[in-house]
């Protein structure tokens, strides 16, 4: 078992998120709290959840380095960080992994992030590798997202954008039917085929979906399959922003 956790958000006395904080004292307090709650002596992988523009990344990386030297943390990770910030952090404390969104539904990391990670020897941990459920074939033009479902606030899932984006699901479905696999398995297998140092983290609440996701590791996509998915997804102009403006401002670029 590898234990990964994060620091980087500030909360009030009621547990409500109030913003970002990567102040050294707050990092240390977050780690102590995580160790206590997890009942462990060390955290395998400690991520900065979001880059705090108020705190130099060198100070953040230096604090994590001290925690590693103290044996409380084993590896340093970052999340939603841009290339320049990653390089600066890596110069102080080697970064083991970067978390960010990546899938057939969101291929922006291919432009700058993936080349930089390959150069620096940093692993990539894509979250939402199934496009928040979009790449499972279970989301349709008529899908209604309930209260508390983050997709209800995401521009890509607004009705007009959703209807246009379903063209992407159609091309993945075509490959899935040919391979006798599910749409989600094809989407995950495509990710796994991109780089050997990519480890997607699909979330699920259901055991059968976990089994389905694991099945993607046995799915062999041929060069022709991959080329079809690459060219097909490139031809679909995904509609709608990834996040609302307020959330987008918390991403380091």
Q: What annotation goes with each model-predicted range?
A:
Residues 1, 40-43, 73, 95:
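Local beta-strand N-terminus motif with an aromatic residue
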Residues 1-11:
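A short, structured active-site edge motif that brings together acidic residues
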Residues 10-17, 209-212:
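A short acidic, helix-capping loop that chelates divalent metal ions and anchors anionic groups
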Residues 13-28, 54:
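Active-site mouth loops of central-metabolism enzymes
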Residues 22-37, 82-87:
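Short, acidic/polar
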Residues 51-231, 246-253:
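Beta/alpha (TIM)-barrel catalytic core signal, keyed to glycine-rich beta->alpha loops juxtaposed to Asp/Glu
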Residues 35-53:
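Active-site groove signature of glycoside hydrolases
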């Amino acid at each position: 078992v590898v234990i990964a956790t994060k620091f980087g958000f500030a909360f009030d006395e009621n547990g409500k998120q109030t913003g970002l904080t990567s102040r050294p004292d707050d990092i240390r307090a977050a780690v102590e709290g995580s160790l206590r709650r997890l009942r462990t002596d060390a955290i395998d992988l400690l991520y900065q959840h979001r880059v705090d523009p108020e705190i130099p990344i060198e100070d953040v990386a230096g604090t994590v380095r001290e925690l590693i030297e103290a044996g409380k943390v084993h590896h340093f990770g970052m999340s939603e960080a841009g290339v320049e910030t990653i390089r600066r952090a890596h110069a102080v404390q080697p970064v083991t992994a970067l978390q960010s969104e990546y899938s057939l539904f969101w291929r922006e990391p291919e432009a700058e992030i993936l080349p930089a990670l390959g150069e620096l020897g940093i692993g990539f941990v894509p979250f939402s590798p199934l496009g928040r459920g979009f790449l499972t074939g279970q989301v349709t033009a008529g899908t209604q997202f309930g209260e508390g479902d983050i997709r209800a606030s995401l521009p890509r899932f607004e009705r007009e954008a959703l209807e246009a984006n379903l063209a992407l699901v159609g091309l993945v479905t075509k490959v899935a039917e040919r391979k006798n696999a599910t749409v989600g398995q094809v989407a995950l297998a495509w990710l796994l085929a991109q780089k050997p140092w990519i480890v997607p983290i699909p979330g699920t609440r259901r055991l059968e979906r976990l089994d389905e996701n694991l099945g993607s590791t046995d799915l062999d996509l041929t060069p022709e399959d991959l080329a079809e998915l690459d060219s097909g997804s490139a031809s679909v102009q995904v509609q709608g922003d990834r996040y609302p403006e307020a959330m987008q401002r918390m991403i380091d670029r």
